[in-house]
Amino acid sequence: MQQLNPSEISEIIKGRIDKLDVTSQARNEGTVVSVSDGIVRIHGLADVMYGEMIEFPGGVYGMALNLEQDSVGAVVLGAYTTLAEGMSAKCTGRILEVPVGKELLGRVVDALGNPVDGKGPLNNTETDAVEKVAPGVIWRKSVDQPVQTGYKAVDAMIPVGRGQRELIIGDRQIGKTALAIDAIINQKNSGIFCVYVAIGQKQSTIANVVRKLEENGALANTIVVAASASESAALQFLAPYSGCTMGEFFRDRGEDALIVYDDLSKQAVAYRQISLLLRRPPGREAYPGDVFYLHSRLLERASRVSEEYVEKFTNGAVTGKTGSLTALPIIETQAGDVSAFVPTNVISITDGQIFLESAMFNSGIRPAVNAGVSVSRVGGAAQTKIIKKLSGGIRTALAQYRELAAFAQFASDLDEATRKQLEHGQRVTELMKQKQYAPMSIADMALSLYAAERGFLTDVEIAKIGSFEQALIAYFNRDHADLMAKINVKGDFNDEIDSGMKAGIEKFKATQTW
């Protein structure tokens, strides 16, 4: 047997080491290691980027969300039943994009922008990235133009401006969606384009919303993005970003748009599901650590941008116009608990909230807006002049009424001033009630507020406030159409309008026809 010299052994090893090729090889293709619950683990995708689209056999796509040392965790967009262990996965070098443009108006699409309304393919070629960086501070402009929701309670006390983020928060089944849908219906003649994003809702509910928008003539002005409860968690997580990109198309071209996210609680639940399946460490209420960033990067994209931004974006094609994207995110609370994790996050991100209360809804006050805890942080500057002038005492009257009503339960005899204040509060509360799918014009709203502010409701029975208001508005639209048209066009409040309203209401009250 031949004996090897130790020095020879070391020479052989050195030679082998020198010949070894240790240069790293970039690989564009990997192998599926495991598939479960819409999550795919892939080995060998060395140069994949976060958020990049990954192509699987059969035209199925995924999105890279976890970049680990020896594998990539990706979420499948759509059905994952055709995928199996051992299949190949390729990098595409692209991030997720969805179709954008005016061709989407009047259509219902899924989270990836595919039409689901049976009206044929989309006739557009333009696409844009789902994840985009929000405009910087320099490119933004302050909010000073109103978005009329058509609700007295909102437009008078919690006004919303173009480019604002106003949260609608409350328990289930108390009119959150109804308020948002009415706001969309009210935009059909305002020139504001609308996007309605349905996240994790029943398909029957989404179909009902689409039907109501069509019946009220607002669908032609609206894009509906639907990620129903039967869709995968990945599509429910992506739907708000897709809708936001579609809304930004209008903002960046000097138009105004309104987007409703219904609702972000379900998006957070979908994201929690994805994160737990990706084995990310859970935090409070089992949500991942970046659930705040999930909503902040979405809602920061709603903004009012300057003329310079629009001009730069359109390469000078549009000049002298600002663009805006107004967001109405909806959050569902559990038994009125606004201190839960997701509600507190979204309250801190948005520019105010409209708080809907179960007790008010159940007592027949609809919309059930609690004026005491609802606030609009930037909308005051955007409020129409006449509404701002006439709504000053409304909020105070309601706040004082709620406080006095609590004490009045224990007091047996009340002084005259307190009794009058209580009665005025009851009348204002009654006046704030409004039927669904019946948004009001600025002139109609101003007339109601004027009657309350100037004491014309004092001798009207509380039970007849609603019929009095309807008859008064009908009378003014018939006999004082010029005055109403002037208010709707300009929104100003002057002595001429003041005296015209006063004389008209006095004349109407003399007829006693309500």
Curated annotation (Swiss-Prot):
The keyword rRNA processing does not apply. InterPro entries: ATP_synth_asu-like_sf (IPR023366), ATP_synth_asu_C (IPR000793), ATP_synth_asu_C_sf (IPR038376), ATP_synth_F1_a_nt-bd_dom (IPR033732), ATP_synth_F1_asu (IPR005294), ATPase_a/bsu_AS (IPR020003), ATPase_F1/V1/A1_a/bsu_N (IPR004100), ATPase_F1/V1/A1_a/bsu_N_sf (IPR036121). GO terms for cellular component: plasma membrane; proton-transporting ATP synthase complex. The keyword Cell inner membrane applies. Pfam families: ATP-synt_ab, ATP-synt_ab_C, ATP-synt_ab_N. CDD domains: ATP-synt_F1_alpha_C (cd18113), ATP-synt_F1_alpha_N (cd18116), F1-ATPase_alpha_CD (cd01132). The record marks S374 as: Required for activity. It is a peripheral membrane protein. Its EC number is 7.1.2.2. Its main location: membrane. F-type ATPases have 2 components, CF(1) - the catalytic core - and CF(0) - the membrane proton channel. CF(1) has five subunits: alpha(3), beta(3), gamma(1), delta(1), epsilon(1). CF(0) has three main subunits: a(1), b(2) and c(9-12). The alpha and beta chains form an alternating ring which encloses part of the gamma chain. CF(1) is attached to CF(0) by a central stalk formed by the gamma and epsilon chains, while a peripheral stalk is formed by the delta and b chains. Produces ATP from ADP in the presence of a proton gradient across the membrane. The alpha chain is a regulatory subunit. This is ATP synthase subunit alpha. It comes from Pseudomonas savastanoi pv. phaseolicola (strain 1448A / Race 6). The lineage of its organism: Bacteria, Pseudomonadati, Pseudomonadota, Gammaproteobacteria, Pseudomonadales. The gene is atpA.
